[in-house]
Amino acid sequence: MPMTSTEANRLPPDVILSVENLEVCFAARARNSVRAVRGVSFSIARGETLALVGESGSGKSVTAMTIMRLTEHDGASITGGRIMMRFKDGNVADLVKLSEKRVESLRGSEISIVFQDPMSSLNPVFTIGDQIAEAVTHHQDKTPDQARQIALNTLKLVRVPDAERRLDQYPHQLSGGMRQRVMIAMALACRPSLMVLDEPTTALDVTIQAQILDLVRALQQEIGMSVLFITHDMGVVAEIADRVCVMLKGEIVETGSVYDIFAAPKHAYTRALISAVPRLGSMKDKDAPEKFPLVVYQPEPLAVEAAQ
């Protein structure tokens, strides 16, 4: 249900998504629950790339999946906060309050996601063309032939070579980098306002990773979409992000422009993440490779609470 004009006016016109004090809990053993996301707030402007960065277990992927309302299928519950999104028609809604049926209709059309491993997302028994076309026919009133043409055009958009032939191929016939391009094509098929990329380059070698990052930047300029980029790699953050939110143990500990985060990191954990990135020339004049001079940061224990 669209929000009232008063509520909509709280969202600046250039903002696509605003997450406010988001709280997510997972049921644990006995009567305990684990607060995986604790008071997270951030916003994403139109055409902007926001990087949500942190180590494994920091809550960054849970935050992204919660925006898509997918964590509820894994036993999680949203215990507080709002997820306000501006749709392509200008209406604003709180995704937390929408029905599952309504949210399902928004996935792919208004907001889409690209996962880390394309082989776990692509169906091995359907062709690439069929899988992209399915997303189109699900959200748009298109004939099978029209959907196939849109699938072809989208493959060309993401720079898949020989796109006509790839339409009739299966996922196992493509390389890892090509499969990830197909996943991005599926996410873009209905031209969503926001694309969530959940560590899309982690399983790829550095050369293909660079190609995917270049592709995302180029697509943003061509389409004008916003991006929420989930990663643990500060090197990737430096390449892709406009703004950065550093996440630790379910909380955002530092936020700033990508320049400010790298030029003057304020939190010890941010400095530790940056120090983990190898620096070209750091081993110059050394007789043998040395260990990276990591900054040690001891986080607080995970919050486990008794269920109410």
What do the predicted segments below correspond to?
Residues 210-224, 235:
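Helical segment within the ABC ATPase nucleotide-binding domain
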Residues 189-193:
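A short, proline-enriched helix->beta-strand linker immediately N-terminal to the Walker B motif
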Residues 243, 255:
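Short, glycine/charged-rich "phosphate-handling" switch motifs in NTP-dependent
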Residues 84-86, 146-165, 274-275:
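Conserved ABC ATPase "signature" region
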Residues 13-15, 91-92, 257-308:
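Charged, flexible cofactor/metal-binding loops and thiol motifs
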Residues 237-239:
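A short, surface-exposed alpha-helical micro-motif characterized by mixed small hydrophobic
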